Amino acid sequence: MTTANVEQKVKNIIADQLGVGEDEIKITSSFIEDLGADSLDIVELVMAMEEEFEVEIPDEEAENIKTVQDAVNYITTHKK
């Protein structure tokens, strides 16, 4: 899976979970500051990404995933 594919799937998950348009989601978007997510939204996003990409994201790692780019980087690095 290419980085572009991962990025698109991450954006799809964010759009579904947060109810924002994909056109509002930039690679540099912060989940909390730019997309209006709260802590529960972040947990749900992480769970959705774990399921979609079949990757485990430990809580201490999830705390460092603050932007779309962070999520894409983590998934492309840790995906089997």
Curated annotation (Swiss-Prot):
Coiled coil: none annotated. Pathway: Lipid metabolism; fatty acid biosynthesis. GO terms for cellular component: cytosol; membrane. 4'-phosphopantetheine is transferred from CoA to a specific serine of apo-ACP by AcpS. This modification is essential for activity because fatty acids are bound in thioester linkage to the sulfhydryl of the prosthetic group. InterPro entries: ACP, ACP-like_sf, PP-bd_ACP, Ppantetheine_attach_site. Carrier of the growing fatty acid chain in fatty acid biosynthesis. This is Acyl carrier protein.
